[in-house]
UniProtKB/Swiss-Prot annotation:
Extracellular side: 17-241
Functional summary from the UniProt entry: Cell surface receptor for the cytokine IL10 that participates in IL10-mediated anti-inflammatory functions, limiting excessive tissue disruption caused by inflammation. Upon binding to IL10, induces a conformational change in IL10RB, allowing IL10RB to bind IL10 as well. In turn, the heterotetrameric assembly complex, composed of two subunits of IL10RA and IL10RB, activates the kinases JAK1 and TYK2 that are constitutively associated with IL10RA and IL10RB respectively.
Glycan-linked positions: 50, 66, 113, 182, 238
Quaternary data: Interacts with IL10. Interacts with IL10RB. Interacts (via its cytoplasmic domain) with JAK1 (via N-terminus). Interacts with BTRC; this interaction leads to IL10RA ubiquitination and subsequent degradation. Interacts with STAT3.
GO biological processes: interleukin-10-mediated signaling pathway; intestinal epithelial structure maintenance; negative regulation of autophagy; negative regulation of inflammatory response; positive regulation of receptor signaling pathway via JAK-STAT; ubiquitin-dependent endocytosis
Disulfide bonding pattern of the chain: 204-225
GO molecular function: interleukin-10 receptor activity
Protein name as annotated: Interleukin-10 receptor subunit alpha
Keyword Cell cycle: no
Length: 575
């Protein structure tokens, strides 16, 4: 019976030794997994604790759905913790089943238990990556190119674009070199363009690949930085914009220059240009200029000269406003002259004309009025008297000064404010034709009558032109027996106004001048036949005129509506 138990004991002992040799003397790896990228399939495991220098690991691989494990002998390296299984899994991207793998530790004759991957290794386990990114700046735009992974072990037709044909997406991140904040952009192809940010000279770009139809993990590519230099700003676009701007500026400048040239007067032809003569001073100039002599008036000699000028022929009423005591005969033509067509008037003038009644002009001023005194012609008819019984001596109201009559003679003075520049003469010879009344404005030259050379009749014939006429509405009548003397004129100028009136000397004391209540027109034309001696009279007396008449009424007054001259009261006369 003992012989029967011996073979059984030997078999049990051998089994126990074999169990000890391949048993759990070594711990197994705790975790095994695949870490794969495109055509880079790496199997990783964790090492066992307290491993020695002689410890190594064995790896077995099988396809999913197959029971046979294939040992991978290239992975038996000392202390290695990973093994590249790419060559054993090249068909991974064409088969959907995947692979499984297991790992154990070996130390001399001791072995550990197998540790298998927890999940099946498929395409979804592949991590998506980008091999590199290329950036190029041109015309102010950044052109980027994404390079997918191109492993050398990749079989023909299994490129990244062929394996992942659809739904490829790339996420692009752009940031300044000195900042952490970035901007992202998504593209669906391996090329992209970026605009250079304003004020950015250096920036960095990185790309993250994605597949919209899978859940693969992805890794950012290596960041690529680009430094934009000054030369890169001079691109074709920038140069084109610069050239166009310069052309526009030059065009505007040319237009402005042309406009200025057109408005600017051109150069005259040489034939029309007269050169300025050179200044030369001849020894004997043809027309030497004589400077105006200015003489200082000697105040001591001046009174003597004034006395001499009083007795000279030049004494008279002039524009200077200075007068003398010597009587001056006024020979200036009257502003308003009666037409001499009436024969009775002419006859009366011829008979009554004598040097008895002549006036003296003393202290006459710019008003040009010469008032006469009958002292020089006493043989004439009735004397002129003041109407109100008083005389104006050296009147300054209108710069008209009157000289008193000689004692025993009637006085006649006229106020320049009332009479102005008006002198009225009687008509002349009947053979003269009717003349139209003419109105003068300004100054008329006055000439002096010389009583010694000619008689009063000759002076009237030569010096009194009949140029003016009365208005027909005036109704002035002169009686036939009226004989009134001609006014004495003084040398000088008589101021004329645009509108003025003339007064005629009176005749006999019983005859008077009458004036109608209506205003008589100075511009009217009257015929000499309508005038008669009986019509030369005035009807109304006007006190403000301050004009005197002899008793009996040679001249009562003039109308209040007569146009008077402006008062000139700025000059003063010594006498």
């Amino acid at each position: 019976m003992l012989s029967r138990l011996l073979p059984f004991l030997v078999t049990i002992s051998s089994l126990s030794l074999e169990f000890i040799a391949y048993g759990t003397e070594l711990p197994s790896p705790s975790y095994v997994w695949f870490e794969a990228r495109f055509f880079q399939h790496i199997l990783h495991w964790k090492p066992i604790p307290n491993q020695s220098e002689s410890t190594y690991y064995e790896v077995a691989l099988k396809q999913y759905g197959n029971s046979t494990w294939n040992d991978i002998h290239i992975c038996r390296k000392a202390q290695a913790l990973s093994c590249d299984l790419t060559t054993f899994t090249l068909d991974l991207y064409h088969r959907s089943y995947g692979y499984r793998a297991r790992v154990r530790a070996v130390d001399n004759s001791q072995y550990s238990n197998w540790t298998t991957t927890e999940t099946r290794f498929t395409v979804d386990e592949v991590i998506l990556t980008v091999d590199s990114v290329t950036l190029k700046a041109m015309d102010g735009i950044i052109y980027g190119t994404i390079h997918p992974p191109r492993p050398t072990i990749t079989p023909a037709g299994d490129e990244y674009e062929q394996v992942f044909k659809d739904l490829r997406v790339y996420k692009i991140s752009i940031r300044k070199f000195s900042e952490l904040k970035n901007a992202t952009k998504r593209v669906k192809q391996e090329t992209f363009t970026l605009t250079v940010p304003i004020g950015v000279r250096k920036f960095c770009v990185k790309v993250l690949p994605r597949l919209e139809s899978r859940i693969n993990k992805a890794e950012w590519s290596e960041e690529q930085c680009l430094l934009i230099t000054t030369e890169q700003y001079f691109t074709v676009t920038n140069l084109s914009i610069l050239v166009i701007s310069m052309l526009l500026f030059c065009g505007i400048l040319v237009c402005l220059v042309l406009q200025w040239y057109i408005r600017h007067p051109g150069k005259l032809p040489t034939v029309l240009v007269f050169k300025k003569p050179h200044d030369f001073f001849p020894a004997n100039p043809l027309c030497p200029e004589t400077p105006d002599a200015i003489h200082i008036v000697d105040l001591e000699v001046f009174p003597k000269v004034s006395l001499e000028l009083r007795d000279s022929v030049l004494h008279g009423s002039t524009d200077s406003g200075f007068g003398s005591g010597k009587p001056s005969l006024q020979t200036e033509e009257s502003q308003f002259l009666l037409p001499g067509s009436h024969p009775q008037i002419q006859g009366t003038l011829g008979k009554e004309e004598s040097p008895g009644l002549q006036a003296t002009c003393g202290d006459n001023t710019d008003s040009g009025i010469c008032l006469q005194e009958p002292g020089l012609h006493s043989s004439m008819g009735p004397a002129w008297k003041q109407q109100l019984g008083y005389t104006h001596q050296d009147q300054d109201d209108s710069d008209v000064n009157l000289v008193q009559n000689s004692p025993g003679q009637p006085k006649y003075t006229q106020d320049a404010s009332a009479l102005g520049h008006v002198c009225l003469l009687e008509p002349k010879a009947p053979e003269e034709k009717d003349q139209v009344m003419v109105t003068f404005q300004g100054y008329q030259k006055q000439t002096r009558w010389k009583a010694e050379a000619a008689g009063p009749a000759e002076c009237l014939d030569e010096e009194i032109p009949l140029t003016d006429a009365f208005d027909p509405e005036l109704g002035v009548h002169l009686q036939d027996d009226l004989a009134w003397p001609p006014p004495a004129l003084a040398a000088g100028y008589l101021k004329q106004e645009s509108q003025g009136m003339a007064s005629a000397p009176p005749g006999t004391p019983s005859r008077q001048w009458n004036q109608l209540t209506e205003e008589w027109s100075l511009l009217g034309v009257v015929s000499c036949e309508d005038l008669s001696i009986e019509s030369w009279r005035f009807a109304h007396k006007l006190d403000p005129l301050d004009c005197g008449a002899a008793p009996g009424g040679l001249l009562d007054s003039l109308g209040s509506n007569l146009v008077t001259l402006p008062l000139i009261s700025s000059l003063q006369v010594e006498e």
